[in-house]
Amino acid sequence: MKKYLALTMAACMALSLAACGSSASSITSSSAAASTEATSDSAATAEATGSANITGIAQCCDVGTLDDESFNQGCWEAVKGYGDESGIEYNYYLPSGEDASDEDRETLIRQAVADGANTIVCVGYLYGPALAWGATEYPDVHFIAVDVNGFDIDSENGTIPENVFCVTFKEEEAGYLAGYAAVKDGFTKLGFLGGMAVPAVIRYGYGYVQGADAAAQELGINVQMNYYYGGQFYGDEKITAKMDGWYDGGTEVVFACGGGIWTSAAEAADKHDGKLIGVDVDQNYLGVEGVESGKYKANPFVTSAMKGLGAAVKNGLDTVNAGDWSTIAGTNGNFGLEEGDYVGLPTDEASWNFSTFTMDEYNTVLEKIRNGEIKVDNTSDDATKPTTSSNITVDYQV
């Protein structure tokens, strides 16, 4: 499985990004119970063909929107691409608001099954309790749970049901690479804007702090970082005002990590000629499109801290469809550089927007993480801050 994921990650990322620019306006909506919204892609209504094991695929999101140009959409493009290639009907289901409950998420699973899905991709760690219920309620349904681990499902023992496959990533490694590269490229006043303080976002952020610190030590310089969780996965006037204050106060680059919250950071960066680091997928295209449309004066994206969402989802679906579920049943695949090229920065020329940081420098630090010479703390507890040197000052804001 690890070998297959390594081979498919780049292809899945390319497929995902090619489609990410499309609008969700072609998707029709219908109301569902318990204050949830179920939506179905109109292009996916054809009869299922060529599949003996998957009769229907559903993606259920824990929070946020589908067109976040990041986590939810990265998974969805893999689901959509798989359905289109295989002739399998696919749908997605969203909670109606950021305050959705476990019962709301159970309702989404219930409706997905009622609509014919026998394979459900649940994205976001908040799906843990709903998965504990759903796996028992629907023992013949396969669940692929992205950014969910066993303790999200079973807080006492961490047991993963046999019809669930959990996929997690070593986001701290991607965050480390982003922070290291930013400082090596000359940035000394950094920012981290997280969505909610959930495990994956925390790992990205703490890795970013550690990488920036390591580069500062190598260069013998001091760097400063503002650090803040917006408490949401979307941008709005409040978050934009916060980012305006940062950039106006001298912040040079912000790692925006949390679904659609990047829009506020990008808006503020454009006003103050600041820079941005994307997350989950290569978000450089958003800056390019923004310039072409006149939305931005210049492309704000320096790089993106990525993880192989599309590869993980596609691999899980392939495994179900091939009748090989037993090879991943009840397990948690945790993917980083030791396991393959599952996290990193985009290295294609179009997305490499560094001024002085070189590809050789990137490959050197990447291999040191891969072989264990550099160990990145993977703490995902917001109360436990990473250990740093005197070369970095982090202002953890609330």
Region locations from a protein language model:
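Positively charged n-region of N-terminal signal peptides that target proteins for export
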Residues: M1-A11
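C-terminal motif of bacterial Sec signal peptides marking the signal peptidase cleavage site
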Residues: S16-A19
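Bacterial signal peptide processing site
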Residues: G21-S23
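A residue-level marker of the well-folded mature domains of exported/periplasmic proteins
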Residues: S26-E37, D41-V398
